[in-house]
């Protein structure tokens, strides 16, 4: 429905995608498209006949993160093929724009879902290269990200936000991913069980500046 919303918000359908204009802010839905979403739902662990296969895959992933290796700068190995659950792949990916700031929200999307969103942006002339902030999918899991996705972003002050619990609960975020993000020139910030705020021209409220996460000396091993 592209009717007008309250608070000066208007939804516009542009070709095959939607943009929500709310005052000076713009929200653009990049994915998933209908075909990709339907495929994800059909293959979801929440679809009864698929559940046993997906649970087996997820168990293997968790067990593969038990050991660590030393981090050697410039020599991070990264799997060419990796996957997450179908329900994660169905997450909405959208771009938020406000006064020159671009933030990409990725939900729990995996490699395929992100590629679907990137391809959609390219085909509709939506430039993502100058996005300043990227919310890393699925609490900073390495299974959801490939190097080609990270190489799309070239803004000088590019920053990654990771929403996760405090400490190393559940193996999130991935130390290997954090080290790779640093090598790719991203400033890495993590909630670690707290809340992060970003403000502009706001009065001092006594907040502390979020500390950048630097490279870890060790990281989880890969079973390549």
Language-model-derived ranges and their functions:
Residues 1, 147-151, 175-179:
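Short amphipathic alpha-helical segments and helix-helix/interface helices
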Residues 1-102, 182, 186-194, 201-224:
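Flexible, acidic/histidine-containing loops and adjacent segments that form or flank the divalent-metal
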Residues 9, 25-27, 131-134, 156-164, ...:
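Hydrophobic beta-strand segments of well-ordered beta-sheets in folded domains
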Residues 36, 112, 169, 197:
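Flexible, glycine-rich phosphate/dinucleotide-binding loops
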Residues 38-40, 145, 171, 199:
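Generic domain-boundary/flexible-linker signal
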Residues 40, 71-156, 163:
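Active-site-proximal loop/helix segments of hydrolase catalytic cores
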Residues 129-138, 164-167, 188-199:
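A generic structural motif
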Residues 136-142, 159-182:
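Extended C-terminal subregions enriched in glycine
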